[in-house]
Amino acid sequence: MLVARASSRWALPGGTIKRGETPLEAAHRELCEETGVTGQHLVYSMQFTGLAKIHHVFFAEVGPDQTPQANNEIEKCKWFPIDGVDALRASIPTKRIVELVYNHEIRKA
């Protein structure tokens, strides 16, 4: 699932970790704030270091009863096939993280 702010590129849901928050707590908060998805079991996947940011990447399994909806500053929220993300107008870290996940999942299959 990717999100986009008004007139912006697609990106993975996320944001800044607040003071006193763990990366896991921030991931839960950002997922809820940006997509309305709550109560998910998040699993830490990896840390990805971009040019100016450190990205803590989590996996979440979203059940059929949870339909993501764009919230707050997010204008669009959409599911994409993992192998189609590279063709999107998306941030470089988003494309790289998805590529790493895709390659890892393909090797496991």
Q: Positions of the model-derived regions?
A:
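N-terminal strand-loop-strand
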Residues: 1-12, 39
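Conserved short hydrophobic patches within well-ordered secondary structure
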Residues: 2-4, 35, 74
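Residue-level detector of conserved, well-ordered beta-strand and adjacent loop positions
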Residues: 3-4, 13, 46, 59
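The catalytic Nudix box helix
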Residues: 12-45
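Short histidine/acidic/glycine/proline-rich micro-motifs that form metal-
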Residues: 17-18, 84-86
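Residues at secondary-structure transition points
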Residues: 18-22, 74, 92
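Active-site-adjacent beta-strand/loop module that shapes the phosphate/pyrophosphate-binding cleft
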Residues: 46-85, 93-105
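Acidic/histidine-enriched, glycine/proline-rich intrinsically disordered or flexible terminal extensions
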Residues: 107-109
